[in-house]
Amino acid sequence: MAAQIIEILSPEEIRRTLTRLASQVIEKNSDLSELVLLGIYTRGVPLAHQLAQQIEMLEQVKVPVGAIDVTLYRDDLKRIKTRTPAKTKIPLSLTGKRVVLVDDVIYKGRTIRAALNAVTEYGRPQVIRLLTLVDRGHRELPIHPDFVGKILPTAAEEQVKVYLQDPDGRDTVELIKG
């Protein structure tokens, strides 16, 4: 039986969702000069850049954006055959900053746990918050996003795929069943 693909978010819905999320981040961070967005590779990075653009449009403030590679911090390294060099790029010390980790989908919470471990190597932030475009549930760790674009209850065997203009050439979120 062929997989069934259901569009969950259209390009317009993604745009509106990112605008709403940017507004929520602004509301929660009165001093935007202390804010840093860290996108988690792969699709968290372009999402973080889009959020920074939205914040700049709304508040005329440039927010620094970094990229974090959690590969070497994962607790399932034994299952990973190849280890790539870390692609982490953080533009400044995180000590005293208000960090928002940005990821496309949260599932079990293991990627976020790895990201938290990675962040502490770049300083001691004042606070770390989590923003995710899609929360599909099924957490194995006590991790809960502070900002969520869409809550999407799924079955364990289903997949959620996020496609973004950069790097995929289109904006859409799909649920894949079967």
Swiss-Prot record:
Biological process annotations from GO: regulation of DNA-templated transcription
Keywords for the protein's UniProt record, in alphabetical order: Glycosyltransferase, Transcription, Transcription regulation, Transferase
Catalytic function, reaction form: UMP + diphosphate = 5-phospho-alpha-D-ribose 1-diphosphate + uracil
Superkingdom classification of source: Bacteria
Record InterPro entries: PRibTrfase_dom, PRTase-like, PyrR, PyrR_bifunctional
A GO term for molecular function: uracil phosphoribosyltransferase activity
This protein's record includes keyword Lipid metabolism: no
Residue intervals passing through the bilayer: none
Pfam families found in the cross-reference section: Pribosyltran
Class of the enzyme per the UniProt entry, highest EC level: transferase
Documented EC number(s): 2.4.2.9
Motif interval(s): PRPP-binding: 99-111
Binding locations of substrate: T42, R43, R83, D103, D104, V105, I106, Y107, K108, G109, R110, T111, R136, V160
Family stated for the protein in its record: Belongs to the purine/pyrimidine phosphoribosyltransferase family. PyrR subfamily.
Function (record text): Regulates the transcription of the pyrimidine nucleotide (pyr) operon in response to exogenous pyrimidines. Also displays a weak uracil phosphoribosyltransferase activity which is not physiologically significant.
Protein name per Swiss-Prot or TrEMBL: Bifunctional protein PyrR
